[in-house]
Swiss-Prot record:
Belongs to the DEFL family. The keyword Nucleotide-binding does not apply. Disulfide bonds join 26-50, 33-59, 39-61. It comes from Arabidopsis thaliana (Mouse-ear cress). Residues 1-26 form the signal peptide. This is Putative defensin-like protein 12. GO terms for cellular component: extracellular region.
Length: 74
């Protein structure tokens, strides 16, 4: 369940980055995300209930970008 959520957050961050670059049109393709999870702090010594979770997500994506700077014939 965490993997799709993390992938969406990465997509959202990259989309904001793309929108902030003028005169370039980019499309994100072929994202491959890996994640791992571990407990950072246990509620008790029995390791039964995790109090603090650590999630690491690493995504590799391909960006296809075209320069669309002012090329009009006006």
């Amino acid at each position: 369940m965490a993997k799709p959520c993390a992938a969406f957050l990465v997509f959202l961050c990259l989309s904001m980055l793309i929108l902030s670059i003028p005169d370039i049109s980019c499309q994100m393709n072929d994202c491959d995300c890996d994640h791992d999870h571990r407990c950072g702090e246990w509620e008790d010594e029995s390791h039964g209930n995790c109090k603090q979770h650590h999630l690491r997500v690493v995504c590799t994506c391909t960006l296809d970008c075209l320069d669309i700077s002012s090329t009009s014939n006006a």
